[in-house]
Amino acid sequence: SQIGHVSADSINPSSANENKYFFADLSKLDDLNKMFEELIAEGNSVGAKLGVCVENCPVGLGEPVFDKLNADLAKAIMSINAVKSVSIGNAENILNLKGSEIRDEIRSDGFASNNAGGILGGISNGDNIDLDFLIKPTSSIKKKGKTVDKDGNEVDIEVTGRHDPCVGIRAVPIAEAMVNLVIMDHLLRNRAQCGEVDQQLPFTK
């Protein structure tokens, strides 16, 4: 949803497969092209904010304490190179809202909101699992920086070779694969442990 200073005004997941940046807002492609041209000329890099949404996830996946679904998802995403933070649900506004505002009330036709991001108490609640994560700008860039040599003397360093101005672009299919693996693991575990348990929701989505 964001690369460097360019953020999406609207999110259309299908648009992500229609451009080389995996960006979900096609109206921002010109801005991205300009930014990357400047980054390449400057020998610099930027970070990115990415999102993964799991739709139609069964209710009941996960554990209440050990092997929480959100903990396993966070571990999988944090295992991707350059990832520095992971959030699930409406994490950005969690400090600005009261409990009465952020709770996901249940109606006869389903949840009224999805601030929890599809996971409550470490267990999937049947709603979409919304996961966001941030990737840092890579430090392997052509622009000169400071370091020390083996004797502790301050020297300049310049990385040569081919380096991406944003490694976040390459992380999109990796994140999808990581999330799929975690969901599949929990599906198999749930089938083994709770195969005969009625897990139907009391409402239709």
Q: Which residue stretches match the model-derived regions?
A:
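Beta-strand segments within the central parallel beta-sheet cores of soluble alpha/beta enzyme folds
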Residues: 1-4, 51, 88-91, 197-202
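Glycine-rich, mobile lid/loop segments that gate access to catalytic sites or pores
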Residues: 1-65
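Short, mixed-charge aromatic SLiMs
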Residues: 2-11, 101-102, 154-157, 200-205
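Glycine-rich and small/hydrophobic secondary-structure elements
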Residues: 17-23, 129, 178, 183
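Alpha/propeptide regions of enzymes that mature by internal proteolysis
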Residues: 31, 74, 173-175
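Residue-level signal for secondary-structure boundary elements
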Residues: 40-47, 85, 183, 192-196
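Glycine-rich anion/phosphate-binding loop at the beta-strand->alpha-helix junction
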Residues: 42-154
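Internal helix-turn-beta structural module
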Residues: 140-205
